[in-house]
Amino acid sequence: MMKNLNGRTHNACYQPYYQQQLQLQQQHQQQQQLQQQQQLLQQQQQLQLPYAAPYNQLQQQQYTQQQYYQQQLQQQQQQQQQQQQQLLRQQQPTLSVYQQQQHAKQSYGHNNSNNNANMTQTARSNMQTASIATVSANGNNSSSSSSNANAANSATAAMAAMCQMQSFLSQQQQQQQQQQQQQQQQQQQQYHNNCAHINYNQQQQQQQQQLQQQQLSTAATTNGDKLALDNASEIANFLASELFMQQLVTFDGMQSAPTLTTPTLTPTTLRTIEETIYELTTEPQIVPFQAGFKPPPLTSLGAITNNNTVTPTTAAAAAAATLAVVNANPINANPQFDLLGLNCNSVRGSDTEDSNGSWNDGQLNDDQSTTDTSSAATDSTSYQNGGHMLGNGSNGGVNNFTVALAAVNNAGRASGQAGGNSTTSNSGTPARRGGGRRPNKAANMSPEEEEKRRIRRERNKLAAARCRKRRVDQTNELTEEVDALIKKGEDMKKEIENLNATKNQLEYVLQAHRPTCQKVRNDLLSVVTCNGLIAPTTLLSAGSCTGTGSQHSNNNNNNSSNNNNSNSSNNNNNNSNSNDSSSGGTITGFDATLNSTGRSNSPLDLKPVLTDEQLLQHIKNEPQDVGLDSSSSLDQDGPPPAKRCFALPNIAALTASLTTPTDPGSCSLNTPITSTAPNIFANFGGDLNSPTLNALNKLPKARPNTLNVQQLQRPFVVQQLGNDGNKAPPTQIQGVPIQTPSTGTFNFDSLMDGGTGLTPVSGPLVPTCSSQNKHPLELPTPTSEPSKLVSL
């Protein structure tokens, strides 16, 4: 959107786009018409009757007359178009836009020439009034009030012309649409009226003629649109001139206005605007230095002789050289390459022979690496002025002329300074640029010294070349080593990724296999001992258990796996002591086995398994403090020894005689030893795996509060196993001697000193509430406190 001086926007510049839209709409309508005609032809072929032949001649005559009239109309339209084009060439360019639009609209075959002429005349009159207003505004600069009024009038006239243009275009569009609709309706009526009388050949002829007419009309419209698009620049000129005519520019208090002959936007300014837009839309061409080589900067355009003396040229010669370069290469994007080729002898820091040798491709040396800096002594003014002639070479082809002018100015300034000082390069010594050896004068040097200098320079060049080669080789070695290390690191990363992938895959397979694994379940239901200790499952899989170990399965007398699973789950969930669920000949401590194998995070707890020789030496590792550790009986209790069970004939008599709950083996040291026993023990010696005793052990029992030490009425008579059958009291049970005190009363001192073979490791046993709460189901001893006695 363009804006005028008042800040208002207008859409006048968008008319070419609007014409393109109209052209697309027309093409779409033509395609629709062709489709409709094809459909009608198909319908007519279906409805064609055999008696339609007599009417063919009349229809042919009518058709020839219509074609003759149409040809005459086309000829008239072509003549009118030619006349109007001739008038356009003679008239102003601003008026050609309206006439071209009229041509484009008349090419459709409409008879609107009079209306178009009237509209163009009104537009011309408005344009003339606008120009007259601007002229009057330019002429009346004496008074500010009159100039402002004329400017306002010119602005209003320009806006009126714009409005008339828009209204004219909109009216023409409406007329075109109406006429197209009328033509379509007429064609449809003709087809419907003559559908029964048209022959197939005549239909084809009419169709071909209509297609030709449509092609002619579309060609005319496209030509008109092309003309309108070509004159878009003229529309822009007209709008710019009309909008910026009334602009008044003040220069130091003086008012001046642009004249009609020199408008504010001249063709040159418009051309520059177009060029800038084109450069912005196109991609800039970045031309780097060829093969990555940046040429050295040039000095002033002068010739350096073999005696290291600079003879500066005049400004005219420098200008001629630069202009010759610019004229020879007007499209070159980098003129410094041509300047290099033209002034190859003016390179700083070398003579003619040395420069030719350094620019040779076969050698590896150049002039910048020499240690002898006598040839590098040049004029500082020429370096400062001539060193910036070429720029950086990245500006492209835009500022070629400015670069050449800068080079000419710098050369002229250098020559002017040299002439003003009235000193020549031959007589005076040039100023030095920094450190280095003091340059020797050419007049004081003999040929021998010159030869020595030349040899020294060659030697220095060779040394510099060797140094560069060594540095390049070292750099290449380091880069190769770095590449090898990078490759090695990448390989290690890939290996780590592969190992992680395999690890994740194995973990996934293990997790998927764990629910369906039968070996884990069998291990959970079995106890394996190694050297008298319970071995975990990991040792079983590793095969570390040798012949000294013994494996026992926890089976009840029912020999069913269902009871096994139910008993194990109940014991594990309740954290009960394992002494209650044992049967004769089996290893108890199933709770500890589950804890050691099922819990992978808990520490390894190895419990001793008692053999037949160690039945009465029950080792029970208990902590010395009140706190619990891994060996406490709350979660991991060692298995008690296997005991021999005797059948009880009467359960009621047994419960009445025994006040404290004991295990089936009455010979355990965990129970108090009384002097007398009930008479029912004389019947022991039956089945060791009695179901009655197992049922008795599973019954819930009350915890006693005191130790029953009363002497019973009947003497304790036990038939000793393995004796000849005498009725004497037993002196030993399974090889362990039994020594009973003479009295029937027991206290703490008598228990400690009574010759039982046990010594205390702590103070007196005092039951506490916390210990009773912690061990609600542990009933191996008369007290609720765990046993604090160890075997000697």
UniProtKB/Swiss-Prot annotation:
Which PROSITE patterns does the record match to this protein?
BZIP, BZIP_BASIC
Q: Where in the cell is it found?
A: Nucleus
Which SUPFAM superfamilies does the UniProt record give?
Leucine zipper domain
- Give positions of region: Basic motif: 452-454
UniProt-listed GO biological process terms = embryo development ending in birth or egg hatching
Answer yes or no on keyword Isomerase: no
Q: What is its main location?
A: nucleus
- The UniProt annotation puts the region (Disordered) at 96-119, 349-391, 413-455, 545-606, 623-642, 770-792
Look up keyword Glycosyltransferase and say if it applies.
Answer: no
Q: Which InterPro entries match?
A: AP-1 (IPR000837), bZIP (IPR004827), bZIP_sf (IPR046347)
Mind naming one GO cellular-component term on file for this protein? nucleus
Compositional bias, Polar residues, is annotated for: 96-110, 349-368, 420-429, 593-603
Region described as Leucine-zipper: spans on this chain: 455-462
The record's keywords, sorted A to Z, are:
Activator, DNA-binding, Nucleus, Phosphoprotein, Transcription, Transcription regulation
Q: bZIP domain location, by residue?
A: 450-513
Q: Which Gene3D superfamilies match?
A: 1.20.5.170
Checking Pfam families in the record gives: bZIP_1
Positions where Phosphoserine occurs in the chain: 602
Q: Where is the composition biased (Low complexity)?
A: 370-387, 553-583, 624-637
Stated family: Belongs to the bZIP family. Fos subfamily.
- Alphabetical list of PANTHER family matching this protein: ACTIVATING TRANSCRIPTION FACTOR 3-RELATED, FOS TRANSCRIPTION FACTOR-RELATED
Function comment: Developmentally regulated transcription factor AP-1 binds and recognizes the enhancer DNA sequence: 5'-TGA[CG]TCA-3'. May play a role in the function or determination of a particular subset of cells in the developing embryo. It is able to carry out its function either independently of or in conjunction with Jra.
Assembly mode: Homodimer. Heterodimer with Jra. The kay-Jra heterodimer binds more stably to the AP-1 site than either of the two proteins alone.
Q: What protein name does the entry list?
A: Transcription factor kayak
To which species is this protein native? Answer: Drosophila virilis
The taxonomic lineage of its organism, from the top, reads: Eukaryota, Metazoa, Ecdysozoa, Arthropoda, Hexapoda
